[in-house]
């Protein structure tokens, strides 16, 4: 199957949602799903579904729908969800602690295996109820050496985000999910996905206000 390398970011952001939908269809014993069924489950239009899928070659036949098992496995491969991905978390504040307690592995094959914070944080040297060890940030390279871990969640205050990101990259991290509301400068080959909760909330309020005006 030929995959178009120039997939738009909007399409890429929907990949995990498609995967989730096909897993739900599979659990409900749905064998075939039309683009309309997929679109309705996603809250988008069927033309968007067909356009998204066109970037991945022939995923289904017009008039026959999409094979649920085939597409579920396709997106699992695409998202590397057949094997567990180990992730570290840096920043054990309120957001960090919430994420440490979130059971990613119950829903997808992702698992936080280590947490890091400033060396003087009382959590350093302890473990979470799920047995995740918390280490001092000064030992991050030591703990990542030969670990094979390339993904990190960054939940430190904004003023430290770039400095910590630099440390992560030096330690071998290639992908960062950042909760800091600023643009991180990273070298080519390192991917940053940003989550700005304030911006998302402001966007929600904007649309609520526009809906009220209508």
Curated annotation (Swiss-Prot):
**Any Pfam family the entry gives:** Put_DNA-bind_N
**One Gene Ontology CC term in the entry:** cytoplasm
List GO BP terms, alphabetically: negative regulation of DNA-templated transcription; response to redox state
> Which residues does UniProt assign to DNA binding?
17-56
* Molecular-function GO term, any one: DNA-binding transcription factor activity
Q: Which PANTHER family match?
A: REDOX-SENSING TRANSCRIPTIONAL REPRESSOR REX (PTHR35786), REDOX-SENSING TRANSCRIPTIONAL REPRESSOR REX 1 (PTHR35786:SF1)
Q: What is this protein called?
A: Redox-sensing transcriptional repressor Rex
Q: Which organism does this record belong to?
A: Streptococcus equi subsp. equi (strain 4047)
Q: Which gene encodes it?
A: rex
């Amino acid at each position: 199957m030929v995959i178009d390398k120039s997939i738009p970011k909007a399409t890429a952001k929907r990949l995990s949602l498609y995967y989730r939908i096909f897993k739900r269809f599979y659990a409900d014993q749905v064998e075939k799903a039309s683009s309309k069924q997929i679109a309705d489950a996603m809250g988008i239009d069927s033309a968007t579904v067909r356009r998204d899928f066109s970037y991945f070659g022939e995923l289904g036949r017009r008039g026959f729908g999409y094979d649920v098992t085939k597409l579920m496995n396709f997106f699992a491969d695409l998202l590397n969800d057949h094997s567990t991905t180990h992730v570290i978390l840096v920043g054990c504040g309120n957001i960090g602690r919430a994420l440490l307690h979130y059971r990613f592995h119950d829903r997808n094959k992702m698992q936080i295996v280590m947490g890091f914070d400033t060396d003087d944080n009382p959590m350093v040297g302890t473990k979470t109820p799920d047995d995740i060890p918390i280490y001092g940030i000064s030992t991050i390279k030591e703990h990542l050496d030969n670990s094979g871990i390339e993904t990190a969640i960054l939940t430190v205050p904004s003023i430290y985000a770039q400095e910590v990101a630099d440390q992560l990259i030096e330690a071998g991290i290639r992908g960062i999910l950042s909760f800091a509301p600023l643009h991180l400068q990273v070298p080519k080959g390192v991917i940053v996905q940003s989550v700005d909760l304030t911006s998302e909330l402001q966007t929600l309020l904007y649309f609520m206000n526009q809906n009220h005006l209508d």
